[in-house]
Amino acid sequence: MTSRRWFHPNITGVEAENLLLTRGVDGSFLARPSKSNPGDFTLSVRRNGAVTHIKIQNTGDYYDLYGGEKFATLAELVQYYMEHHGQLKEKNGDVIELKYPLNCADPTSERWFHGHLSGKEAEKLLTEKGKHGSFLVRESQSHPGDFVLSVRTGDDKGESNDGKSKVTHVMIRCQELKYDVGGGERFDSLTDLVEHYKKNPMVETLGTVLQLKQPLNTTRINAAEIESRVRELSKLAETTDKVKQGFWEEFETLQQQECKLLYSRKEGQRQENKNKNRYKNILPFDHTRVVLHDGDPNEPVSDYINANIIMPEFETKCNNSKPKKSYIATQGCLQNTVNDFWRMVFQENSRVIVMTTKEVERGKSKCVKYWPDEYALKEYGVMRVRNVKESAAHDYTLRELKLSKVGQGNTERTVWQYHFRTWPDHGVPSDPGGVLDFLEEVHHKQESIVDAGPVVVHCSAGIGRTGTFIVIDILIDIIREKGVDCDIDVPKTIQMVRSQRSGMVQTEAQYRFIYMAVQHYIETLQRRIEEEQKSKRKGHEYTNIKYSLVDQTSGDQSPLPPCTPTPPCAEMREDSARVYENVGLMQQQRSFR
């Protein structure tokens, strides 16, 4: 499990319901301390627009649900029921599914806070990426609600006097919203505590001085808190000699990992294929390239096009798990590759094309026109394309195209080309709103077509703007599915798409733009939720303490995750006799989904 921030240390049952109903979706859950039984915990799960609360017993030896499986830690219990669907049931047999953790706000926006990280994982990180004095703060696994300061000591080789790598862990207690290390001064925040011990180093009992010299930063963030992360990344360097800072530092770190992605590109390097590449050194990886199957068997290179399949959940491909949406990242067409482009679109059953460049920019050809004029029909090798109509929006042109194979009349299908026209020749757009509106239209079109193949995305080289659009779309899809409190990781997502096509997201400006676009999306979503809550409260007068079981749905497609209104918290009371639903003991099963 990558995060244990589903644990909310300071909320009541009423507050848990309010959070789950306003910020979660069905399947969202959180854990919290039990108010009625101090030392125990409660699992709160949103189901069918309502919230079920499940008691978790902490005997001092193990955690369980007052019966059933026993676990050493709260995290292991939650992970087990997340992974083993069908094990957690009510007495009437209804399954309770833990799908989406509703994360607690991080106690700090500082990048040295890593959230859920085990001691071993912290040691591995500090040993591999840190140096003497590197530190991070993480959640305590053994004491939910507390934290741990992990510090690398020894020399820069990570070795202490006995020649072994050394990482020291210091427990940070959180009591009554104050933080301390088990004695001495108490602090109002984790940041205050860390800043204090940076200036006043702690000393271990054996005399080792714990110097907090430089933080080992994380790139994972809670999507809802992206504004705080952007603010941190936008800070200017403290001193003129400290060049690496914020966005530049993160992007440069990402660039340094390119050496890990040196996969073969032999097909693109073949002499016969060189004239099919717009740029001689921007070539597709062999392991993810689109292979054209309908070429001339006497011409082995007829299967080549400079394009790669991009799967958002690439690591699951080996498990035969098909992601909901995939992409084809490709270069802008050359005159001699237009026929191959349409062969690819037809073969992959792609119904949506995203073009992010003009045909000519700054006097240079970026992509030849690969579609006919409006109302015209044109043949491209074995493919026929008819331009049914064109319509212009503020930032883009939408073309409805009919694609078929020459001589095969029953093969005609509709392909929609979204041509984004307002990306500036230099840099990135000043306002991400236009890009987000554009991607929203693309998303709805793709969703509306049954069994549509990958979305084809191209610019000129097929890596810069193409990578930027794809990464933004992937991150927004995650938020759509899991809600605003999910974890996202921009560098990790870029690294994932780069493992499938080299060089995706080319500049620091594009990297920063991804953050700005996601921030803009989140802010729009949060305003929408606030307005819906206000509207519901004005339109309804609540006369009892029951919660609304009606999901907020509408006939039109919403670009934002669903949310369910709830009465003001002041009108509710926590009553253990009412709050807790009966949950039957788990039935032992052999097969898991």
Swiss-Prot record:
Domain Tyrosine-protein phosphatase: 247-521
Family matches, as SMART domains: PTPc, PTPc_motif, SH2
List of residues that carry N-acetylthreonine: T2
One family name in Pfam for this protein: SH2
Modified residues (Phosphotyrosine): Y62, Y66, Y542, Y580
One GO cellular component, as annotated: cytosol
Binding residues annotated for substrate, in chain numbering: D425, C459, S460, A461, G462, I463, G464, R465, Q506
One function term, GO molecular function aspect: peptide hormone receptor binding
GO biological process: atrioventricular canal development; axonogenesis; Bergmann glial cell differentiation; cellular response to epidermal growth factor stimulus; cellular response to mechanical stimulus; cerebellar cortex formation; DNA damage checkpoint signaling; ephrin receptor signaling pathway
Catalytic residues (positions): C459 (phosphocysteine intermediate)
EC number: 3.1.3.48
Phenotypic consequence of gene deletion: Conditional deletion in limb and head mesenchyme leads to increased cartilage mass and deficient ossification: osteochondroprogenitors become chondrocytes and not osteoblasts caused by inability of PTPN11/SHP2 to mediate tyrosine dephosphorylation of SOX9.
Domain named SH2: residues: 6-102, 112-216
Tissue: Highly expressed in brain, heart and kidney.
Keywords: Acetylation, Cytoplasm, Hydrolase, Phosphoprotein, Protein phosphatase, Repeat, SH2 domain
Main localization (coarse): cytoplasm
SUPFAM superfamilies registered for this protein in UniProt: (Phosphotyrosine protein) phosphatases II, SH2 domain
Post-translational note: Phosphorylated on Tyr-542 and Tyr-580 upon receptor protein tyrosine kinase activation; which creates a binding site for GRB2 and other SH2-containing proteins. Phosphorylated upon activation of the receptor-type kinase FLT3. Phosphorylated by activated PDGFRB. Phosphorylated upon activation of the receptor-type kinase PDGFRA.
InterPro entries per UniProt: Prot-tyrosine_phosphatase-like, PTP_cat, SH2, SH2_dom_sf, Tyr_Pase_AS, Tyr_Pase_cat, Tyr_Pase_dom, Tyr_Pase_non-rcpt_typ-6/11
Catalyses which reaction(s): O-phospho-L-tyrosyl-[protein] + H2O = L-tyrosyl-[protein] + phosphate
Compartment annotation: Cytoplasm
Oligomeric and partner information: Interacts with CD84 and with phosphorylated SIT1 and MZPL1. Interacts with FCRL4, FCRL6 and ANKHD1. Interacts with GAREM1 (tyrosine phosphorylated); the interaction increases MAPK/ERK activity and does not affect the GRB2/SOS complex formation. Interacts with PTPNS1 and BCAR3. Interacts with phosphorylated LIME1. Interacts with SHB and INPP5D/SHIP1. Interacts with KIR2DL1; the interaction is enhanced by ARRB2. Interacts with GAB2. Interacts with TERT; the interaction retains TERT in the nucleus. Interacts with PECAM1 and FER.
Domain comment as written in the entry: The SH2 domains repress phosphatase activity. Binding of these domains to phosphotyrosine-containing proteins relieves this auto-inhibition, possibly by inducing a conformational change in the enzyme.
Described function: Acts downstream of various receptor and cytoplasmic protein tyrosine kinases to participate in the signal transduction from the cell surface to the nucleus. Positively regulates MAPK signal transduction pathway. Dephosphorylates GAB1, ARHGAP35 and EGFR. Dephosphorylates ROCK2 at 'Tyr-722' resulting in stimulation of its RhoA binding activity. Dephosphorylates CDC73. Dephosphorylates SOX9 on tyrosine residues, leading to inactivate SOX9 and promote ossification. Dephosphorylates tyrosine-phosphorylated NEDD9/CAS-L.
Matches recorded under PANTHER family: TYROSINE-PROTEIN PHOSPHATASE NON-RECEPTOR TYPE 11 (PTHR46559:SF1)
Name of protein: Tyrosine-protein phosphatase non-receptor type 11
